[in-house]
Amino acid sequence: MKSLIVALAIVLAVAFMTLAERKLMGSIQRRLGPNHVGFLGLLQPFADGIKLILKETVLPLEANHWLFVLAPFLSFYLALLNWLVIPLAKGVVLMDMDLSILLILAISSLGVYAIIYTGWSANSKYTLLGSLRSTAQMVSYEIAMSLLVLTVVYMGATLNLTELAYLNSGTVLLWSLWPMAMIGFVAALAETNRAPFDLPEAESELVAGFMTEHSAISFTFLFLGEYANIITISTVLNLMFLGFYNPLVIYLFIWIRATLPRLRFDQLLRLGWQYLLPFLIGFLMIQPSTLFVLDLF
């Protein structure tokens, strides 16, 4: 029952995040955004959801129908699975595990398979290229994210996300890891395929990327999975570096989408492999030694 309540809460959070995104982007672009459905457009996400659910699901003739239907659901299911170990409030968590951070990393790695299946099962060149782009991007930045988490875990001496959040209430760990928080946010943008790293969904090149052939309920699950991942990774970054919940990270996701242009694919991979990865390896070696010598931690 608790898991069902959390799942419904995440769906509602996704609904209102899309509304906030459209409102904020409208404000940045000097327009109103949704303002007709309900008071100030507050019912717009529900109208969009009902519209998508009532539409007909079109199955491409040459598609692998089983994978085509199941892959979007797998994407959303994996996004929800993380919330088993993420603390919902102080002392409130569905499953308090000592290895909760490790479980989150494992689940995020499995998300690559859902995207591969989504793109391959449609038997379309656009969906396949979009899924391959997304896979290469996620694998590249998954390494950076893993090293980032390793550094934080090394400093906090725990793999329990709840304990790490309490530990971050102190200022020493927080300020010493401030550069890592910036890199973590960049890696989070790439992990969730958000601007300026939204190459898997580049409309001018790949129509809608790996979601091109999906419609109705299958598109709804892909959409829910994408935005649920944004909420999940924003929450994890908050707990790892700030020690509390702050909507600022989600606001930055939206603000950057409205302001920054899309990178080229070679620029994206170069940033991950030639800049972020060496910096993280160097930081992993230097930071603990520096704090030990200065007797700060």
UniProtKB/Swiss-Prot annotation:
Catalytic activity reads: a ubiquinone + NADH + 5 H(+)(in) = a ubiquinol + NAD(+) + 4 H(+)(out)
Concerning Pfam families, the annotation shows:
NADHdh
One MF annotation (Gene Ontology) recorded for this entry: NADH dehydrogenase (ubiquinone) activity
Q: What is its main location?
A: mitochondrion
Kindly give the InterPro entries that the UniProt entry links to this protein.
NADH_UbQ_OxRdtase_su1/FPO (IPR001694), NADH_UbQ_OxRdtase_su1_CS (IPR018086)
One of its GO biological process terms is: aerobic respiration
Q: How does it sit in the membrane?
A: Multi-pass membrane protein
One GO cellular component term: mitochondrial inner membrane
Give the first-level EC class, as a single word.
Answer: translocase
EC numbers: 7.1.1.2
The record's section on PROSITE patterns has:
COMPLEX1_ND1_1, COMPLEX1_ND1_2
**Where is the protein localized?**
Mitochondrion inner membrane
Q: Which keywords fit this entry according to its UniProt record?
A: Electron transport, Membrane, Mitochondrion, Mitochondrion inner membrane, NAD, Respiratory chain, Translocase, Transmembrane, Transmembrane helix, Transport, Ubiquinone
Tell me the superkingdom of the source.
Answer: Eukaryota
Job of this protein: Core subunit of the mitochondrial membrane respiratory chain NADH dehydrogenase (Complex I) that is believed to belong to the minimal assembly required for catalysis. Complex I functions in the transfer of electrons from NADH to the respiratory chain. The immediate electron acceptor for the enzyme is believed to be ubiquinone.
Q: Which family does it belong to?
A: Belongs to the complex I subunit 1 family.
For this protein, the record's HAMAP family field holds: NDH1_NuoH
Protein name listed in UniProt: NADH-ubiquinone oxidoreductase chain 1
